[in-house]
């Protein structure tokens, strides 16, 4: 299969919402659920879907809540997003899945692995640290706070979504191109598809709503008690030239706080790639994914 081959488009009902997803691979293959980030869509995994399908996996990449062709209905808090993934696994007729998440999709994957371990066969996080690490880093690291300026901007009412949707969501294309270390990785037709998706009524506000919900959650006092740690085998793929996230977010000391005792992750840094790793270095990502999953 080639990345430019047509993929299946499927509709799934999960957690009371209709989800659109792109899919590839044998219906009875081991399930790999690929969760996109911001400002992306399920199609951001267009290079990985054929590679996973060719290796015998059933690969499914949904537009997440509020994105693309999926329903707009909130809320966008982590508990709801976790339930969405659980519902998607059930809607696909499975009990467990490997979760592969990039950026926000990675944050959801980390949360599902911690909160619903029975659902997660394996976890792959692509340029996304453990769930609480980013806001902790924003508190203690000026470098990360500067890189995360947009998260603070997104807390303003109405202005961020208006700017995001303006001029046919031109800022989305600029974010994808500008956030990539490698040049020429976004064909014009892909950029046009993203712009069209985020220019639709309500879509920019929904995507920014994820940040608002997470920020409100981060401001709440933490409940006392033992933190839930991830026991699923974990692979971390990281484009080292990320403009938005410091590589310190996946230092061993950070990962030890998020992972169960004895769960030693494999961490792979791709030195000549940036935040949008699966699009900047698709062959490297595909190779790492297929080889690591094949060790199961």
Residue ranges of model-derived segments:
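Flexible "cap/lid" subdomain of the alpha/beta-hydrolase fold that forms the substrate-access gate
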Residues: 1-8, 17-19, 60, 67-100, ...
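Conserved HGGG/HGGXW glycine-rich cap/lid loop of the alpha/beta-hydrolase fold
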Residues: 23-69
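Short hydrophobic "strand-cap" motifs at the C-terminus of beta-strands
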Residues: 35, 270-273
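A short, glycine- and basic residue-enriched loop/turn
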Residues: 41-42, 107, 273-274
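Alpha-helical elements of the RecA-like P-loop NTPase motor core of helicases
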Residues: 43-46, 205, 287
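Catalytic histidine-centered segment of alpha/beta-hydrolase-like enzymes
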Residues: 273-282, 286
């Amino acid at each position: 299969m080639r990345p430019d081959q047509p993929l299946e488009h499927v509709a799934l009902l999960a957690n009371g919402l209709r989800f659109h997803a792109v899919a590839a691979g044998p219906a009875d293959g081991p399930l790999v659920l690929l969760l996109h980030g911001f400002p992306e869509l399920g199609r951001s995994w267009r290079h990985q879907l054929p590679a996973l399908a060719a290796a015998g996996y059933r690969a499914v990449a949904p537009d997440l809540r509020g994105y693309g062709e999926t329903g707009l209905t909130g809320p966008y808090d982590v508990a709801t997003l976790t339930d969405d993934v659980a519902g998607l696994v059930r809607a696909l007729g499975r009990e467990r899945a490997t979760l592969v998440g990039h950026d926000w999709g990675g944050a959801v994957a980390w949360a599902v692995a911690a909160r619903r371990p029975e659902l997660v066969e394996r976890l792959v996080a692509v340029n996304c640290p453990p769930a609480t690490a980013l806001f902790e880093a924003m508190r203690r690291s000026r470098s990360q706070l500067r890189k995360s300026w947009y998260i603070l901007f997104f807390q303003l009412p109405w202005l961020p979504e208006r700017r995001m949707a303006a001029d046919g969501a031109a800022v989305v294309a600029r974010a994808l191109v500008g956030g990539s270390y490698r040049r020429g990785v976004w064909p014009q037709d892909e950029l046009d598809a993203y712009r069209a998706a985020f220019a639709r009524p309500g879509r920019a506000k929904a995507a920014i709503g994820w940040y608002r919900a997470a920020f409100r959650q981060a401001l709440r006092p933490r409940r006392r008690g033992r933190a839930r740690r991830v026991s699923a085998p974990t692979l971390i793929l990281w484009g080292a030239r990320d403009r938005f996230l410091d590589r310190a977010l996946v230092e061993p000391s950070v990962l030890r706080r998020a992972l169960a005792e004895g769960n030693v992750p494999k961490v792979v840094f791709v030195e000549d790639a940036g935040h949008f790793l699966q699009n900047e270095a698709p062959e490297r990502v595909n190779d790492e994914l297929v080889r690591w999953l094949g060790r199961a």
